[in-house]
Amino acid sequence: MDHPLPAGRLSPPWKLFADHLRLTVRLTPNGGRDAFDGIDTDSEGETYLGARVTAVPEKGKANKALIALVSKSVGVAKSSVSVISGETARKKILRIEGDPEDLARKLEVFLE
């Protein structure tokens, strides 16, 4: 259920499932501001959405800030966003509960 993209554009860093979307994020904690840096690829060619938060990576503070940033950006409750992989790593996979097509549309702004 991934969205096809025109030639030359990066593939989206998310996958759609029946009741949620999984988003790959590379987080920069202590990043000076809470914001997204756009989509990029890692050394293995996997795409991710870059994000930075002002919170430090202690006791889950940066993860909580990331969840708040993502939930606000796609218009869901914080409780609808969870880290399912990479709890202590910079690269994380987030599960966002909701209509996956609607969530993907809201994230497509980062593909432009």
UniProtKB/Swiss-Prot annotation:
Matches recorded under SUPFAM superfamilies: YggU-like (SSF69786)
Pfam families: DUF167
Gene3D superfamilies documented for this protein: YggU-like
UniProt cross-references to InterPro entries, sorted A to Z: DUF167, YggU-like_sf
SS bond list: none
SMART domains per the UniProt record, alphabetical: DUF167 (SM01152)
Domain of life where this protein originates: Bacteria
HAMAP family per UniProt: UPF0235
Family of this protein: Belongs to the UPF0235 family.
NCBIfam families from the UniProt entry: DUF167 family protein (TIGR00251), PRK01310.1 (NF002348)
Protein name (record): UPF0235 protein RHE_CH03912
Biological classification of the source: Bacteria, Pseudomonadati, Pseudomonadota, Alphaproteobacteria, Hyphomicrobiales
